[in-house]
Every structure is written in structure tokens, then in C-alpha cells.
Amino acid sequence: MKRTGKVLAILLALAMLLSVTAFAAWDVYGSNANHNSVVDSAPTTATTTALNSYIDLSNGGRGWDGVDNVPVMETVNGTTYAYVLYDGYSSYGGQLAKINCSAATPYVVWRKQVSAAAGFQLSTPYLDTTNRAIYIGASNASVYNNVAISSPVALTAGTAGTVTIGGLSLLTAANRVSVPVYVGHTSVADRGTLTTEGTATIQLGGGTPVNLTLSTTQSSSGTTYKIYEQATYDADGNVNGYDYYYYINHSVTASSTENATLSISVTLNGTGTIESVSMFANKGAVTKVSGIDSTDASGVTLTSVVSSVNGQINTPITRYGKYIYFGTWSGNTAMQYYQVDVSRTSFRTKTMTGTAGFYWAGAVQLGDYIYFGGDSGYLYYRDSNNFDADTEVTLITSDVSGAGNVRSTIMTDGTYLYFTSQGGYLLCYKPNATTGKPEYQWSAALNATSTSTPTKVGDRIYVGVYSGFNKGGVKCISASTHAVKDVIAVTDKNNFPVQCSIVVKGDGTGTDYLFFNTNSGSSTTENANYGCGYCYSYDGTTATQQWASRSDTYALGGMACDNGIIVFGNDYDHLYVVK
């Protein structure tokens, strides 16, 4: 967006905030409070263009991690948006991007740095459509609430623009400072002609100043940052120009952690603007992202909810009433599950310590109780009004030998609890009507590993499975007879590990449509079938492929669907929008 329109855009965003109408949303893992990924509308056919094109969020980076969780989505005033948490690799840290999915060519509305450094982002966010915010859990993401600027800082040629923030109490001596510097806009015809360069200096807590070079030609490396180009779009998704930024994301070390001062100085050979300032400690954290209706990242703000979290936040963030829930993981160590009251600005926190850690194991509420699985084969339950009280836990291996880790989110149909285990089982429990304790009902052997949260339509329960790094498929289990059928047999397909949940369009009585992606390999060779997104029809007997996206790379997290639009990403930070 051109700078002359920035003030108008901010005022427009504020006006929109007061009039936003969200008609639909996939706002949490599994799309709803039950985590049952059933949708009324989804693309059962797709164009070749949609299946072979993607939004590249990587900014040129590459790694073993990218989009490794499920996006959240909403439709506002007729336009469908996706919010994607992903790894921006070493240059950009963890990022949150807002995508306009309804445009003829989907595009990035804004992107915001949300963590200090590169790393897997496995926690699916929670979208608060009422209060217009997103809660994210990430590694190296303890944001300092008091490191911010109230308005952008204008830069003139040859004169240093400065930001000074004092009185800081630092969580760690080493921290990472994020400073996006806007340097101009060009038309499509003048693309790449901007010559604005400069220098920057960052100092924290009396430590050694870090001197940086901002260059239009040199590659980003060490203390050098190359200019970044971001296309701008018209209402139909057509490119109508380019914005240019220097995205400073640099580690600085303080010599004193108390009453520390952060000093930033930027000098350009042209005009520009310091858009915002953020600083992150190298600790896990949950952050509230506000200003999501802004038309660019300058209006997006970060507020620390829980800082200095030990271990990785690898579970989805779920919400019931005024509480959000998430778990942590660190190898075989006993770790914590959190309940956080987000109705208060103080974000009151309660925790319980599990026998082991929590990985992909999102929580569900049924009645007054919260249920979630864990490693070493445990099923936990807690009274939502007394979350940190000692409560008996259920060891599922006492009911099913060899059940293994529970690395799926719990799904409920309102009566029963369903989940899978890495030992290769679909399990069903029912809460005791008096005590809330989950009581074993039945299980079904899948004959393959599963981390897939079950999806239930009618009598059919669908789960994804995998065997090793190459084989996998989809199973259909009868809720009444517990019989297991192959939708896609593990022995039938190569490059087909399905670790995600299955999105289903249908009612389980006729033909259902199943949507999922595969976590396998890397290849752009046509028909190589690495890391694809798929749609299959299944009538209870026969499965037929309806479409498949291009061969790409590992796609772990799974799909989201809203307003008939499917989105999913992969480890190359490629985001597919299928409609």
C-alpha cells in the first residue's frame, strides 16, 4: 500500500473493527469446540491452476520446518481470510500471516514476526472472532509488552531516526529485536528500481552495539539485511505495485538485565519509516495478537499472555468460556498443561503436571471437565473450575495393551470421547456422569500408527494413519460395530503418510468427501506425489480420488476449510488455497 494511503487505511481498519461481521469461521483446531472436522461446503472439484499454484511465505528461506500446524480461518463481510502461523527461517523467525483467500489470486494482507528465531511452529492458534484477536503458542516468543512505539517514526535522508525505550527488566541477557523499516512503493512498471539503503545500530542494556547494513544488492547474511519486496494487490487479487522493507531481526546481548535501555538508530539515503519495534526473549510463550483487521502489519500488536514457558508448545490452543488451554513437551520429562484466564488483563494461570509431556494433544471440554491425552499413554481429566487440583488419571494401556502415546486432540460427539494413539488404536471413552472420570468403552486396532484426531459423521469415524516415512492411508471405523475398513490401504500407496485429521463433507450415510494432506518427501516431479493435498470420495465401500495438488514437500499440519475454501501449507512455507 502506498504511504499516502497509510493514515486512511488505519482509520478504515478502526472503522471496520466496529462493524466486522464474521459469518463463518474455522477458529480452532478441528473447526469447532468438539474438534470434529466436518464441513458443509468444500471444493470437491478444483482447477489445475489452484492445485499447482501456491503463496510462497518463505521470503527465500528453506528448512525442515515451515507451516506445521493448521491455519485458522474466518469469513468477514463476504471475504474469507486465513491466518497462518509458520517458521520464517533464520532471517525472519516465527511469523503470522493474514491471507485474503477470496481474491481471484489469493494474497498476503500482512505478516507479523511473532517469535525470535527459526524453529518448528506446531501449535495451532485460536482465533477469537468476537474480540478480534488470535492466541498463538511458539518457541522463543516471550514478547516484551513494554517494547513498542506508539506511532511510526519518520526517516529523512541522511538523518538518523531513533527509538529509545528504558526501564526494561529482561528475562534473558540475549534477546532478539525486530524492526521493520518501510522504504517505499513502486508501480509494477518500476519494480526493483528503488535504491534506498542505509545502516542501523541496536544496543541493549549497556551491551556491545550491533551495527547493521541495509542493502538493495547484497544478500542477507550476518549483519547485512537485503531489501524485501512485498507485492500489493487490488480488490481482485491483481498485483498493482510493490512495497519495500528492511526486516531487521537481530540478536542483541545486554550486559545488565535490570533497568536496561534499548536504543535503535536507523539512517537511510532516502526516506522511510520505522514501522514498529518488538523484542523477544528466547523462551516459549503464548501471545495475544490484536489488530488483526488492520490492512498492514503496522496496526498488528503483540501482548504477552504467558511468558517463560518451559519446553515446546506443541498442542493446539483451545478455548472454553474464559479459559484457553495448551500443553508443553520436552522429551520424556514430566511437563505442564495450562489453563489461562484470558478475560483478565493479568491472564491468571493454573497448571497441572503430567506424568510425561504433551504433543499435539489438544484439550476438549465435555460437561464441567476438560479432557486431554499425553505421552506414555495417559488420558487426563480436570474440573474446569478447579484445574490445578490433584485428580486421578487414566492409563489407557491398562485398557488397551500397547496403546502408546496419545498424540491426537480429543474429539467428542457430545457423549463420547474419541482419540487415536501411536500404538495404532482408535479409542472411545465416556465420562462418568457423577465424577467426570473417563471410562473405557471400546477400541479398534488400526494396524498402523496414528496421530490423527478422529472425524465422525453418522456411524463413520475417519482417521489418518502412517507406517514409517513412506506408507500411510485413511481408515473408516464403524462407531456401532467398531469394524475397520480401508479407505486408502497402507499397502496401496507410496509417499502417503497421513498424520493430520481428515476434513469431511458429508453425513456418513451416502458419499462422503475426505480432504487431507500427506507428510512425505520432497519432489516437484509431476505425479511424484510428495506432500500433496487430496480430495477423495468414499461411499462406504469404494474410494475415488477427486483431485490432488502438485507434488511438493512434507505437509504435516492438515487442512482448514471455511466458506468452501481449503487451505494448507508445508515445510517450504508454500500455502495452497483451493476453491
Model-assigned labels for residue ranges:
Residues 1-8:
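Bacterial N-terminal signal peptides that target proteins for export
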Residues 146-199, 203:
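Autoprocessing Asn-cyclization modules and mimics
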Residues 25-148, 222, 230-243, 256, ...:
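Extracytoplasmic/lumenal domain signature
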Residues 20-24:
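Sec/Tat signal peptide C-region and signal peptidase I cleavage site
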